[in-house]
Amino acid sequence: MKKLLLSMALLMACTFTMAQRSVGTWSLIPKVGVNLANISNFDVIITGLSPDSQQDIVEQKSKYREGFIGGLDVQYQAVDQVAFSAGVFYSVQGMRFPPSETIDEAKVHYTSDDVQWKYDYLTLPLMAHVAVLPGLSFNAGVQMGYLLSAKGRASLSQFTVDKEGKAHYQTGEKGNLLYAYTEKYDNLSYSKRFDVSIPVGFSLEYSHVVLDARYIFGLTKINKYTQDSMKNKVFTFTVGYVFDL
């Protein structure tokens, strides 16, 4: 058993050692993955009346939303343990709010659902990769981003509730709901086009397949006119394939 475990360990070590490149090697690494994105200090206050007619103030904190990321890294092996890379990526970021409901003095219920902001960036990460174990590296650098679009949407509705707890929506002549609709917003003119952030994380390479996990925290405000310091914060998970040149 000990010989078997030792043989397996040696085999794994040899396999991961293959991920270490010769000094001077250039590599192309296409990657795709998913973002879990949020925006700091992007909170809202919703006021209404609670069922006992008391003032109801609800603070809604932004939540993480999923988004696509994909692009290409060009990597150079500078020394045995250190490589540098530059990349270009399309990155979908933003945030979302959980559903909410408030009640006014006339006992009309107002709900919001599917509230989210979608920020599409072209990002340029410049990274240093330091090998900590064969096949495993710690990565850190700086990332510049250019905002391509900034859009939001919210599904809104209002209704009354009878004594039996049944909801009633107002309808038009054709049976359509009068106060249940989706609003869309374009926030590009209120947003800063350029963004600077710091990405840090780890990557694991096995047989030219590389798994990368990063946390990206923004250094610059994304909004132009509000005093709150709203900044990007993103968890990024990608898978790529290394083509050595």
Predicted regions and their residues:
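Bacterial Sec-dependent N-terminal signal peptides
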Residues: M1-K31, V239-L245
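Mid-chain, structured segments of secreted extracytoplasmic proteins
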Residues: G71-A106
